[in-house]
């Protein structure tokens, strides 16, 4: 009996010792710091169950701890997501699950990037990459919802990572008009040789694609697969129609075509055909630093097949110059990270410029096409957290009717946008709005959803559709009254474009 009591006493002592080693950070400290976040409960739970128990001395230290915490949870969530594959009952569930695996992988990568001591990461960079990580998780959930397969796999996916990401965004929060130090017109990761290459209007090509066999490759995919090294890899795609679905994961790839309507990349995937919006893209730019010039991106699924993306970009610091994007619903998916579009054409019907990037379209032509219903919506911005530094900015552009819409203008309403997510942010500045724009300007998504929390603004637009006298009176809509207000949404400030847009691509930094 004495031996048994000794065993019990030793066991209790061992439990106390083990508990002390995993008791986590000081509970009083944790409560004080976590109370400053939008989601204090998961913050408190995971910190008090962490193996560390040193005092948290500063906000920067709290941010690092929170980053490590969300990274650990994201890795666990990614591992868990892999195990859910066998639970998928059909091809639609499998399609949504496969997207989630990719998106969790990208999420872990982006969080890692913010913490990597070998990667230069300003507060603005961190806010961008954390915003992207949260967008990836939102996109994962959206895939199940849009395919109508939410009852088996989706409930098994935890929201803890999303909540912890929201916390890190709040801790790291960058003032909205934050502008990083000026560089010499290029980002720090572009080497001197690449800078010279990008300054040339006719860059030296690393590979040539031609359908007639006159190049190094007959398909664009073959050329991308051959891309090597960490520097800029320029692929010249000769005139022709290339029926390919491409996911470009390599960094610093440039596709150079012969011009809009000459070099055409086309596909036909769609939600109606059983894929997710995310995976329907004819071309998906994933690797950072992607550049396209003189190319038409097209999805031919048609208006009846619902969402069908021509181009999706999640490439940070990506540039599209003199390109066109052609489809119907969800044409241009500005998914995440920082993106710039100059002298481009965009064609579509419903939500045809959408996503949650920090995206500026400058000097572009936006063509509304004839919809299946009687309603067009140009934008659907997807900002889900108030601290994400994202939004869609249309600057110095033109919004008009495509040729197929003109005969039915009288019976079709076209709106500047509608709020896809709670904190949707869209601005039209110094843009010509033709008479197709409904006097209300903007459309509800679902009743009163997001009308108080969205940020929709207009500044010095022109044309018959530009009058703001009949615009919506939502709390989140405003007409910007001064250049200082509007300048927050220019390329120079919103994208810090002067520090990374290649000098070979013209852009207007201010208003």
Swiss-Prot record:
The reply to whether Signal figures as a keyword in the UniProt entry is: yes
**Example GO biological process term?**
defense response to Gram-negative bacterium
Q: What are the boundaries of the region Pectinesterase inhibitor 17?
A: 24-171
The annotated site for Transition state stabilizer falls at 329
Where is the protein situated, by its record's location annotation? Secreted, Cell wall
EC numbers listed for it are 3.1.1.11
> What InterPro entries does the entry give?
Carb-bd_sugar_hydrolysis-dom (IPR006633), Invertase/methylesterase_inhib (IPR035513), Pectin_lyas_fold (IPR012334), Pectin_lyase_fold/virulence (IPR011050), Pectinesterase_Asp_AS (IPR033131), Pectinesterase_cat (IPR000070), Pectinesterase_inhib_dom (IPR006501)
MF terms from GO for this chain are:
enzyme inhibitor activity; pectinesterase activity
| Signal sequence, renumbered to the chain | 1-23
Expression by tissue, per the entry, reads:
Expressed in siliques.
What's the catalysed reaction?
[(1->4)-alpha-D-galacturonosyl methyl ester](n) + n H2O = [(1->4)-alpha-D-galacturonosyl](n) + n methanol + n H(+)
- Give the residues annotated as active site: 330 (proton donor), 351 (nucleophile)
What does the record's miscellaneous section state?
The PMEI region may act as an autoinhibitory domain and prevent untimely PME activity during transport.
Under what name is this protein listed? Probable pectinesterase/pectinesterase inhibitor 17
What is the originating organism of this protein? Arabidopsis thaliana (Mouse-ear cress)
Q: What is the lineage of its organism?
A: Eukaryota, Viridiplantae, Streptophyta, Embryophyta, Tracheophyta
